[in-house]
Amino acid sequence: MAVRNIIFSVIIPTHKRSVLLSRALQSVKSQSQERDLEVIVVSDVIDSSTDAVCNFYLGIDDIYIRRNGVAGPSDSRNLGKSLASGHYILFLDDDDAWHPDFLKNLYEGIRLHPNHSLYFDCSVVKETRGSSEPRFISESVLNLVNILTMDVYVKNQVHMSCFAFPKALVNNLSFDRSMRAYEDWDFQLSVYDQEFPIYIPLLGSRIFEVDDSSSDRRGSSQAATDLNAVFDYLYVYRRHPGPDDRIREMRQQLLTSVGFRIDKDLL
């Protein structure tokens, strides 16, 4: 039997959201370049509906794990990354999806820029999740050309699902399980400390957002929006010192705007 040459590994952490996970996996498994893809789903809870969805969509060469331990995407992503066989690592939230032909277009991108981190466009879908099935409201495309700049050391700029990372580059990086939020940003900065991603003009992920009370996104929770967010920012700043005086001044201004006065030389 011929050994598969896996180009892409996509890691999908999930937590008891089988309906949304089904949408994500359907978009992944319908890719025209799907033969070059390994799908790794990591659930942090025992859930029969999640089992059924993974049994339906995943193939013999894919991986589905129900892990123990503290719930949360960081440990799930770290576990998935440690098992990945692809030359490139992608991350997808269980409530998001991929556009058709994304992988085919991404394959052309990596041929132009081999062994380099890449980022790409996305669309943002507004929906409500008050019923058993999410209800579509609107969708708009985000062109991310020139969006990623050194100002990312002040605030995050690009969604995690808009990147393809060479496995060799991120092998020794991990998501910080101690963070309440912004662990994606912290991980990205660890990449930028090594190299800055290259933009390629293709439409990648569909990022689904819920603006009403039916939202269950962790980033919309109280822990991610109150002063805990400031402490997580300080934590990220400590782990990734400002690369120049301009960035340190911008960090200082941001913290001052929420009532924290800190010497810029500490940022």
Task: Tell what function each PLM region has.
Residues 25-67:
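Acidic donor-binding segment of Leloir-type glycosyltransferases
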Residues 25-26, 86, 99-111:
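Short alpha-helix within the catalytic core of nucleotide-sugar-dependent glycosyltransferases
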Residues 143-227:
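Conserved nucleotide-sugar donor-binding catalytic segment
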Residues 89:
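Short aromatic/hydrophobic "clamp" motif used to bind/position activated sugar donors
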Residues 75, 104-169, 217-220, 237-249:
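Flexible acidic/His/Gly-enriched loops in nucleotide-sugar-dependent glycosyltransferase catalytic domains
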Residues 68-84:
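Glycine-rich, basic loop-to-helix element that forms the pyrophosphate-binding segment
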Residues 1-27:
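N-proximal low-complexity "stem/linker" segments adjacent to membrane-targeting elements
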Residues 93-97:
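The conserved acidic donor/metal-binding loop of glycosyltransferases
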